[in-house]
Amino acid sequence: MIITVEMADLSPPRGTRDFLPEEKLLRNSLVAALQKTFEKYGFNPLETPALENYDILASKFAGGSEILKELYTLEDQGKRKLGLRYDLTVPLARVFASQKLAMPFKRYAIASVWRDGPMKAGRYREFTQCDVDAVGVSSVRQEAEIMALTYAAFKAAGLDVFVKVNNRKLLNGLLDFLGIPEAKRVPVIIELDKLEKIGAQGVLKELEAIIEPGYAKEALELFTELEIEKSLRVVEGMALGEEGKQGVSELKEFYSSLEAFGVPDGFAVFSPSLARGLNYYTGIVFEAFLKESEGSGIKSSLAAGGRYDDLIGKFSRAKEKIPAVGISFGLDVIAEVLKEKNAKLVKTSKKTVVRVLVVPFQNYAYALKVSQELRARGVACTVDLDGKSVSRNLDFANKQGIPFVVFCGAQEEKEKKVKLRDMQSGKEELASLPSALVKLA
């Protein structure tokens, strides 16, 4: 059956979106603010392909079985199996393992990723991640620096957030304390990570499918109690094994470093059930959420990450351990929050990049000369090339949010002037070309 244009569904694939200029400009301004923050902290840009070899994405060192359920796969004409990247961390690991890069290697990447998973407010199947990662630093001071960067980034965006913090070593230590077998810990961790999302009874049901009901109930009770306390002192007093104690020690050092980085008290909150779903995390993990004071209906995390000391080394032939830590900001969900709260960033957003509409009065040569002069001074402008009426041009400028209109006729050319209209005030003036250029630049 031949599909004609008339028969085709013109909407984008489910879970993807088109961004019209007004929204795209908002997103661009948010990206620019994030890039500025990332670079202030010494992170450099890196770009990788949207497509990766399937073996890289499906590697046991990569995201794990949960994420593979959401992987988009395809074959090229050479029958090679490929996949769309589901995050920007695995491509970073591949690049670092295949290149001779000096450490510490601090990079940021801003790009689309794809996951064929469930959708909800602020969550899509194609979405943009804004990642920062530092490779080659084993000290938890690196986590503290990333926390400072996170605080600065959300402050620049005008959002009041807090970050949940935990340590996978402590989490493993708590599961060991409960007597949960090592082989069962990864699926148990995945379910505990859902405590706030599906509630205690939902988690209990899932845990009972993995471990004995008695263990499941005991685990749920312990983590529920610890979540209420949210105190490192409580877990520090428990009879934990070596791994658990190391997790506590790292968290204490992390918190003591935050003050030196200028991170205020209460920004990073200890959350003992926080696990992060991806298997490659090895140490401190974190996840950022809006504070209730924002009054948003969006409950999804805005950023998340952690330490993954084993991932990059296992991609390399030498198989050495290479310390790494990073965080990923969700551009889409942050943009949704900003729109929802009608923040300053949205109020000042514009519909177009155009600053000046140049209108010829049957004098295209002069109008084009003026437009080129404007562009030479860095002013974005567009020219009416269709000979529309004055009223139609003014209506267009008003609808598009173009702040100025310049009229160029034979008389204006003769006097080496232009008629300049301020669309906000409605005032018009006849100005010399040099003075108009200065005013518009």
Per-segment meaning from a language model:
Residues 5-24:
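Auxiliary tRNA-acceptor-end handling modules of aminoacyl-tRNA synthetases
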Residues 23-41, 52-53, 69, 87-100, ...:
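Positively charged, Gly/Ser-enriched RNA/tRNA-binding surfaces
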Residues 45, 81-84:
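A positional/architectural concept
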Residues 50-82:
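Polyanion/phosphate-binding surface patch
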Residues 67-76, 180-203, 290:
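Acidic, His- and aromatic-enriched active-site or binding-groove loops in soluble protein domains
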Residues 124-130, 165-173:
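Short, conserved phosphate-binding/catalytic loop or strand-edge motifs used
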Residues 164-165, 188-192, 381-390:
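A generic structural motif
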